[in-house]
Amino acid sequence: MGPIDTSQRLARLRELMQERKVDVYIVPSEDSHQSEYIAHCDGRREFISGFTGSAGCAIVSMTKAALSTDGRYFNQAAKQLDNNWILLKRGFENMPTWQEWTAEQAEGGKVVGVDPSLITASDARNLSETIKKCGGSLLGVQENLVDLVWGTERPARPSEKVALHPIEFAGKSFEEKISDLRKELQKKKSAGFVISMLDEIAWLFNLRGNDIPYNPVFFAYAIITQSTADLYIDEEKLPAEVKNYLGDKVSLKPYSSIFEDAKVLGQSAQNKSDGEASAKPPQKFLISTRASWSLSLALGGEKNVEEVRSPITDAKAIKNEAELEGMRACHIRDGAALSEYFAWLENELVNKKTVLNEVDASDKLEQIRSKHQHFVGLSFDTISSTGPNAAVIHYKAERNNCSIIDPKAVYLCDSGAQYLDGTTDTTRTLHFGEPTEMEKKAYTLVLKGLISIDTAVFPKGTTGFALDAFARQYLWKEGLDYLHGTGHGVGSYLNVHEGPIGLGTRVQYSEVAIAPGNVISDEPGYYEDGVFGIRIENIIMAKEVKTTHKFGEKPWLGFEHVTMTPLCQKLINPSLLSDAEKKWVNDYHTEIWEKTSKYFENDELTRNWLKRETQPI
């Protein structure tokens, strides 16, 4: 968690900037597919700054360096950045955004450089306008300068084999999905859709890969028109069964040829437009609002391209019945694994007085999970955190630099797994000793927020932006809050963080209404820096519900929870719960016992633990 000395790396980067007449250089977190989680070879921001969090942007001028990140990572960034760096806390009053800070450095006609494959076209336009106001200019630098600094030490690009995702789990064939997409393209009168998001490609073709840790995706692009379906992928990644499965319905092309083909398509669209009557609007290619600037430029820019919220993202977010049933099933197995783990951990720490560190514990959890049906791997790096480490929202325990678990302190475990039938993400906060009154109060207020989301009933058209305050209301009444969203979309054996829906104050969460079939996390928290952290997280699925009345004749929605792991009885202060909330807790625990106790018929330790933790409060 401690800082590394970035002085030499920054010095070399500044030499390269000087050679290319670039005064300020931007290093985003994302890869060329705008992935949140990336392969090791794409960890450029981490390499140049030393900050390992999943979100952030580094900016380097000739004399300064800044790292911008959000509230999940303030503590972590403060610990990991050396004295070469300024921390820009996103969302803090009187703190500039990274775009504003960049523009300040560009005053007086300076040039700001960025790899155009690592920034979206819309972000590039907005940034260019911001920089222009200060007299600077934005330049797309085709050769990535951090890669040149990294040199031969940069990890190789992964090239793992791709596998079929069976129809029993996908619930819909890739032919049906492409047919649905073509209907959307027809509605928009578009020439085709150029797809760059990796999870969208995996979902569309019912394929899964292993190129990015914890995310079952593979490096590829795709172009879908009314008559063609082209998949751009290195062919050695495709076993014979995958090629046979795709058959003649999909043309395979080299991954590296996407930009040349995009240029040809763009030129063809332009020529066609020039030759047609001006009264008829030209057909444009659709790209996602999250597609790269370089892809937009290859297609000919705004005259040939329309940027839209991807229709695949919208379709993928509404799970079909097979996917929903898979989510229910995998969360029962995952809940059983977590109960076995927590029972084991308590026994080791309290009864056996075993000395365990945070990584020892998380390794055991992975071992337990791996025994369950359809297990593939973890869905993210487990957060196993004791005491003050639990206050670091996205804490990462390193094997050689982690804490011994203190049975007299709060223990927070945020973990998830990839199963063939679904993706899990569960957080539980426990205490193996005697919690303080403040710890119990904080836990119970967080629990009330979780229940408020879980039991919410709302009209069709309601967004996650509107629901976010439901989870915070009890903390707010005490003058408390948390610096992260309340929930994110979850993929079906895909990325654990999935758009476009979620619960929070992000602009995107105000743009898309929650719909039946959405799978979302419900994870309020509270963190006291240097002391303790609390988070409780369940996965919930949106569904239509019956109401006594139906104002406006709209459908009304609610949620179904699928996470099957007990809450920590010891941390609940029942006097802070209403009768309805107590009933919710008791009903939830009864459901957990009924669905998971069968796994422990020959495991007395876990069965006894589960029985105790699911007793009525």
UniProtKB/Swiss-Prot annotation:
Cofactor binding note of this UniProt entry: Binds 2 manganese ions per subunit.
Residues that hold Mn(2+) 2 according to the record: 414, 425, 537
Gene3D superfamilies: Creatinase/methionine aminopeptidase superfamily, Creatinase/prolidase N-terminal domain
EC code: 3.4.11.9
A GO cellular component annotation in the UniProt record: cytoplasm
Enzyme class, spelled out: hydrolase
Residues holding Mn(2+) 1: 425, 523, 537
Top-level taxonomic group: Eukaryota
Keyword terms: Aminopeptidase, Hydrolase, Manganese, Metal-binding, Metalloprotease, Protease
GO MF entries: metal ion binding; metalloaminopeptidase activity
Catalytic reaction annotation: Release of any N-terminal amino acid, including proline, that is linked to proline, even from a dipeptide or tripeptide
CDD domains: APP
Reported function: Catalyzes the removal of a penultimate prolyl residue from the N-termini of peptides.
Record-given protein name: Probable Xaa-Pro aminopeptidase P
Species, as recorded: Ajellomyces capsulatus (strain G186AR / H82 / ATCC MYA-2454 / RMSCC 2432)
Lineage of origin: Eukaryota, Fungi, Dikarya, Ascomycota, Pezizomycotina
